[in-house]
């Protein structure tokens, strides 16, 4: 899980979701693409 100030889709399988008020990227194809916005 990467924590970044700005999250972007890294491939076509990435999805942007909002959980508990946080913006997150989840990826079914490559788990390395998981990201969360905020510090």
Swiss-Prot record:
Keyword terms of this UniProt record: Ribonucleoprotein, Ribosomal protein
A cellular-component GO term for this protein: ribonucleoprotein complex
- What processes does the entry annotate via GO biological process terms? translation
Q: Which SUPFAM superfamilies match?
A: Ribosomal protein L36 (SSF57840)
- Among the Pfam families in the record, one is Ribosomal_L36
Which molecular function GO terms apply here?
structural constituent of ribosome
Q: Which HAMAP family match?
A: Ribosomal_bL36 (MF_00251)
* Protein family according to the UniProt entry: Belongs to the bacterial ribosomal protein bL36 family.
Kindly provide the name given to this protein in its UniProt entry.
Large ribosomal subunit protein bL36
Record organism: Limosilactobacillus reuteri (strain DSM 20016) (Lactobacillus reuteri)
């Amino acid at each position: 899980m990467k924590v970044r100030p700005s999250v972007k889709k890294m491939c076509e399988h990435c999805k942007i979701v909002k959980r508990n008020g946080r913006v997150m990227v989840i990826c079914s194809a490559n788990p390395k693409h998981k990201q969360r916005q905020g510090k």
